[in-house]
Amino acid sequence: AGPQLAIIEAPMGRGKTEAALWLADRWLASGQHTGLYFALPTQATSGAMLKRVKAYAEARFAGQTLNLHLLHGLAAFDETYEALTKRGTPDPAPADVYADDAPTNADLIAASWFRGAKLGLLSPFAVGTIDQALFGVLQTRHQFVRLLGLAGKVVILDEVHAYDAYTTGLLERLVEWLRALGCSVVLLSATLPAAKREGLLRAWGAATPAGWGAYPRLTTVVGGQVRVEAIPPEPVSYELKVLSAPDGQPTQAAAADLLAGKLEDGGCAAWICSTVARAQKVYRRLQADPRFAHCELLLFHARFPVARRAQIEAEVRRRFGPPTDEETQ
């Protein structure tokens, strides 16, 4: 069927990642594609996604040796990726022998050759930041190597709504190149403005459909034909309150009062700040407040030393992320 495009728009937690991996698996099974690159906006989200792609590859490609790499500037500090780099290539078994103890999982490695400068995208499977792919459409040295690494693969681009106007322009050029290189592409977004959605379709060479239908939606382009399908919504309710501080009282003080009441009998809460300095100030405030003495406080921002940041990130995933295999057994 040639290169295909899918745009999945749905709220957080609706399974967009699983749907993208399912599509990738179908396209890889067709024999038209040679690998997978999963691109995300940040290093933290890339590290978390590596574990999910690793679990998929281990279950799906049993008995095979596959290269899986993490591509961003601090990948060497990721524990999961470090473990992959220490694995050697196993001795191949005779082709006509299949023992009772034959492996049921893929043997994933991160060969040193692909860890060279600008070579990461040549790995058959990789997870990383979006800039690794965007360098392929910029006038940078050896940009053709990045395009060569992407050619013929399934490429998943996450959080496409999160980029500014400049990066969105680069993203459209990337989508245009990916189609020319024989890639099939999945775009994931929570909410995608119509103008941005139409721009991405034009970059793929597709026409804008007559109507977009209801949200959440799945938009596919196969052989130049655009199809829009509504995804059945799940009944989910949220309670959103706007906190108004009394006259003369700082907003942070009012928010602390609200949290103290909510957490009096236990529970979890996240206080999300727009700057590192503000997050540090809130953290010190809660530390000094006796009403939070029974709470475990965790400060998480991008200015920690790399090793410490990785530890905190792992702790955040452990506390607030999905359960691991060990926890569900």
Residue ranges and their predicted role:
Residues 1-329:
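N-terminal helicase ATP-binding lobe
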